[in-house]
Amino acid sequence: KNKLEKKLKSETDTKVRKDLIDKIKGYYRQMQQMPCVMEMDEEYRRLKYVRYADDFLIGVVGSHEECGQIKANITQFMKDKLKLELSAEKTLITQAQEKAKFLGYEITVRNSKATKRDKNGVLKRMFNRKVVLLLPREVVKNKLIDYKAMRVIQTNGKEDWKPKARSYMMNCKPEDIVAQFNKEIRGFYNYYSIANNVSTLCKRFGYIMEYSMYKSIAKKQSSSVRKIKKKYSKDKDFVISYTDAKGQCKCRVFYNEGFKRKDAQCDAKCDIMPNTNFLPAS
């Protein structure tokens, strides 16, 4: 490939240049199909353990039989030392390309031949063998149903999500309705903000919540969504002005910060105990 590229720089004949370019592209296609590293060293083994409360996940570089032995050892240890029973139904051995559920996420390893140019313009397979965190669609659906913000109807054999008014909020002030929706949207987004598909699914979550909020306020004021949006719209935002208990004029703005994916904070010192020592006042 390098020889052909060098020859291409000095070649002036149009037909020869075209043939050289076709050959170079062919070499690039072959290179993109070849693994850049050894896929599996048969003698290499590794185990990674992650726990939160009573949920844990173990990643193993090894065979299925070895994973079975590890599971059996953990089951015996928990029974003998901790006096706990390991649920056989929930404790599964999952191949890396399949989806494993952990703390509300689905975790998998991407198998992709897709390419992307790096900052130097070099075409690379950046997505293959990467661990991916996914927000499950069912989690979004169930959360919206739990909030009573959505109803599901069947259209031509497919699910259709429709926002609806939250009737139990009819006694709340409009600004309090907006505040409640904002709190729920931020809470859901912040928890799943490191998921690879958070932008797509949280946009849908946000849309349903937004129109549920419109419908809730419209129902409270015996109005329509169109009239409510027109009444409270201000510079592309939904803003409710109100007077607080102290007589001060304030505004409540509906969530408008988007659903961009955030980077995981791998260096967060969440396990370090706080220093509670203090010096007495002199």
Regions found by a protein language model. Give the residues of each.
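Non-catalytic terminal/accessory segments
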Residues: K1-S282
